[in-house]
Amino acid sequence: PAAAGPRDGRAGAKAEVDRLYGEAEAATERYNAARENTRRLRAEVDRAQDRAARAQEGVNRMRDTLGSMAGAQYRSGAIDPSVQLLLSSDPDSYLERAAFLDREGERRAALLRKLRGAARTIARTRAEAGHALAGLERDREAVARHKRTVEDKLARARRLLASLPAEDRAALDHAASDAPSAPGAASPRATAALDAARRALGRPYVWGANGPTAFDCSGLTQWAYAQAGVSLPRTSQEQRHAGRVVPLSQARPGDLVAYRADASHIAMYAGNGQVIHAPHPGAPVRYDPVGMLPVSSVTRV
């Protein structure tokens, strides 16, 4: 068979670089999701520990009250058997005999019930904190794992690009740079988000970044909509569900365009068949044709 020519070699290199960037983007979105979950779990742990601390303060106050009641009886010359049970290690037996106590004893019984309820709350809250901490550790490991995957894919892509002649590298990284003349956006907030994305043109791609000086793909769209007062989820997979899905043929400026079956890349439609997006490391925020990758969905926020 005939030897592959330079064009075939460049096409093969482009396919391999595209594959590596695609895999790196998928890993980046998994990294973003794991990092967001880590933040959520950290907040859960903090809230659980705060609830446990407040409950413990209540327990301490009730124990002080019970101790004062026992001390008063001791100074009066006798300790009621009910108090002995109250301060024993088996409060359930006290509750079983609470019906035999006098009114003062009933007050102590009610206090003991509160004490036992607070103790259960502390145990439950500490268990919740322990569960959240275990999840936090798992997600920290996932963050580190996805980070290693991204770095490996990007390093391989950089090595492949570095091995190509300069003109081939330029051809692989060619992108549209002229702003399209767009029809009207779907809403004022979409207009504001698109304006923000345009202000980000030329800023660098940094995986895991969400502005204002650098972005990954979902970080750009999240930041742009935040400038319009709209809170979007962090990952491209979540963002594709952040509004109403419309056909690509009906895309309006400001719509989110998700790519590949796993929605591992996302861009903002800018009109006239163009999108603004953060492509990959080494390529700044820029315009590209909407069909640069297989489109999986278009979402109107």
What residues fall within each predicted segment?
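Short, exposed beta-strand "edge-strand" segments with a Pro/Gly-rich flavor and a Y/T-containing core
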Residues: R51-A53, S82-S89, A157-L164, S231-P233, ...
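Extracytoplasmic
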Residues: R61, D80-S82, S89, E96, ...
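Amphipathic heptad-repeat alpha-helical coiled-coil "stalk/arm" segments that mediate oligomerization
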Residues: D64, S68, Y74-D80, L85, ...
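Residue-level marker of structural boundaries
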Residues: R75, R103-E104, V230, P284
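Short, highly charged low-complexity linear segments
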Residues: Q84-L86, A119, R124-E128, D152-S163, ...
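Peptidoglycan cell-wall recognition and remodeling modules
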Residues: P180-V301
